[in-house]
Amino acid sequence: MLRAASNFRAVANREFACAKRQLSKTTRKNATAAATRPGVPRDEREGKEIYTTVGIDHNEPKFDKILIANRGEIACRVIKTAKAMGIKTVAVHSDVDSNSLHVKMADEAICVGEAPTAKSYLRVDRILQAVEDTGAQAVHPGYGFLSENTKFAAELEKAGAKFIGPNSKAILDMGDKIHSKKIATAARVSMIPGYDGEIPEEDFCVKVSREIGYPVMIKASAGGGGKGMRVAWNDKQAREGYRLSKQEAASSFGDDRMLVEKFIDNPRHIEMQILCDKHGNALWLNERECSIQRRNQKVIEEAPSSFVPPEMRRKMGEQAVQLAKAVGYDSAGTVEFLVDSQRNFYFLEMNTRLQVEHPITECITGIDIVQQMLRVAYGHSLPLTQEQVPLNGWAFESRVYAEDPYKGFGLPSVGRLSKYVEPRHVDGVRCDSGIREGSEISIYYDPLICKLVTHGDNRQQALDRMQEALDNYVIRGVTHNIPLLRDIVQEKRFRSGDITTKYLPEVYPEGFQGTVLTHAEEKTVIAFAAALNARKLARANQFLNQNRQRSTHVASFSKTYKFVSSLPAKEGQRPTEHAVEVSFVDGDANKAKVSIGGKVIDISGNLSLSLPVNSIEVNGEHITTQIVGKRAGEITVLYKGTPFKVQVLPEQAVKYLQYMKEKAKVDLSTVVLSPMPGAIKNVNVKPGDMVSEGQELVVMEAMKMQNSLHAGKTGRVKAVNVKVGATVDEGEVLVELE
């Protein structure tokens, strides 16, 4: 796989102001792209990339300028390819995104409104005005937002600009899940049993669900990305699922039509990437496995799938192409299938856009999908035949989110990235991101930080590289889901390929609790923390004596330092305390012998508390750790993705701990707290109402997802502290019970 590179001149920073309800425009200096060899370039900030082995013909006719109607990582991704092809780029942004990376990377930038997507990125009129003002010849919609909006595609065509995606009729045919099922059936694509029509209200939803037979999947006809979807196992869940999904669909897509189909228990989610042009050519670019999901949203994807043999791959690909040709498809798209344990596959939906997880297909085929979208939109034919599409190695994508994985596998988090270092130095790593150190993760948009991609000669190598990359990924300032990702990639079932869409609840039935360490690993973490503390004390002892001569150094690092250390215990248990002794080998501050429980552990490396990443040797084995917290008597060590608070106290300090009172635990069953920042959509109770345990009290929306908040006990409502439309912070008390 070639790793293409080029250097871009630095672009001067510019502030972009956005007047309320008014379109404003700012043009920046052009950035220069000089590709040193075929492929997609990088700028100096980005390090090495993995995109494509297909070259760029700079003599081929192309667009002069395109506008990217999106934000974040996907806008940056499109800009990179456009620049490599010599195409100028225009970014659009909301007022809060004025200093975002995609704005800085583009040649021009236009502010299209306020932070809420409905007032900016979804404003078709303002995007069209930006196209006219900048003279952009075409628009790439990315994914989400307007990417599957037929009105937008049609309006662009009327305005004389190209939509870098499929024609509006294909979007309409495939975007409506009810209509797309009928087309897929006619195209002889394998189908899931279900009701072929719109579900108008709750009672009818229950009636249809009973006829199909529980469990059923209730989902939005215009949906995607896991939004507007619920699984129901009984009448009660069908009613609630219908109502919540309908509200979510209206909010996310502006279309609340619902459908119901049979839910296939324990399926795999496998999709086929397709690429079509306007000359009747259509290719399938092999499959991606997307079974690791939470709330119907993908967490880790891989390509190819370990479950799909060559003949099945061919059949899935051929059916995907049959469907594409049936609707006159003419761009990149994805046909999604559910696959049962017997390798029967059923059509799920077609995404008429560039898929989030497209990078792993690019890694195994060497085809830059964005490049081909730009070529096809201009009118060129595809450069390959089906026989020329390769399958080289294996690739994984981990979606790194600003989410708390300990809360429902990932409740969104907000904040500013105070420290941010991507692991681009690791072999076979690609990082698709739209943020940088100092960027803000807000409540208005998807909390995706980065798509971390690794490629290897085989599945094992790609997984090992992912493990190393996650260990070296430095993120401070926001809560993130790397602990969950890191635990998954080392978990036995996942590494063997034994996965379904139920993987997360089956492997983590009580929710994600963090990586469980073996006794040997516990001692490794404790020994490392003790060695760090001993080095800190030794250096402090040097400064007690103002004589900086070598003799002082030797004395400080020749002592044996004694501690009592422990890791947090499970609730209701006392932590196991370990007597630890640390000595330095020949006075070397970076070579320590740690005695713990009668076992000696040799640790070497840069034993510094100030490094973002510590790469060390423990008894000759290489491990990577991070120090993510420091306070008196405690060091928080990030090991295998999970933070562990290690208590490291001098012996004399331990005796005083018995006099320290523990904090009284707060009874949280009497209050309903906001689990994250967001907006209140529904309040279902008022003061004085009697409620039962588990009853829905409040519905809130954050980062385009609706969350139902329930009573923690049976009782009377004492106070309701919020109203519909209110914006709340994490931990805010919404409802109080007596």
Swiss-Prot record:
Main enzyme class: ligase
ATP-grasp domain: residues covered: 181-378
Residues reported to bind Mn(2+) 1: 336, 349
UniProt: Mg(2+) 1 binding residues: 336, 349
CDD domains: biotinyl_domain
Cofactor: biotin; Mg(2+); Mn(2+)
Residue intervals of the Biotinyl-binding domain: 663-738
Chain positions recorded as Mg(2+) 2 binding sites: 349, 351
PTM notes: The biotin cofactor is covalently attached to the C-terminal biotinyl-binding domain and is required for the catalytic activity.
Positions bound to biotin: 409
Gene Ontology molecular function: ATP binding; metal ion binding; propionyl-CoA carboxylase activity
Keyword list, A-Z: ATP-binding, Biotin, Ligase, Lipid degradation, Lipid metabolism, Magnesium, Manganese, Metal-binding, Mitochondrion, Nucleotide-binding, Transit peptide
A Gene Ontology cellular-component term: mitochondrion
Residue positions binding ATP: 177, 209-270, 296
CC cofactor note: Binds 2 magnesium or manganese ions per subunit.
Presence of keyword RNA-binding: no
Matches recorded under InterPro entries: ATP-grasp, ATP_grasp_subdomain_1, BC-like_N, Biotin_BS, Biotin_carboxylase_complex, Biotin_carboxylation_dom, Biotin_COase_C, Biotin_lipoyl
Binding residues for Mn(2+) 2: 349, 351
Gene Ontology process terms (BP): lipid catabolic process
Coiled-coil intervals: none
Domain notes: Consists of an N-terminal biotin carboxylation/carboxylase (BC) domain that catalyzes the transient carboxylation of the biotin covalently attached to the C-terminal biotinyl-binding/biotin carboxyl carrier (BCC) domain.
Job description of the protein: This is one of the 2 subunits of the biotin-dependent propionyl-CoA carboxylase (PCC), a mitochondrial enzyme involved in the catabolism of odd chain fatty acids, branched-chain amino acids isoleucine, threonine, methionine, and valine and other metabolites. Propionyl-CoA carboxylase catalyzes the carboxylation of propionyl-CoA/propanoyl-CoA to D-methylmalonyl-CoA/(S)-methylmalonyl-CoA.
Protein name, entry field: Propionyl-CoA carboxylase alpha chain, mitochondrial
Gene: pcca-1
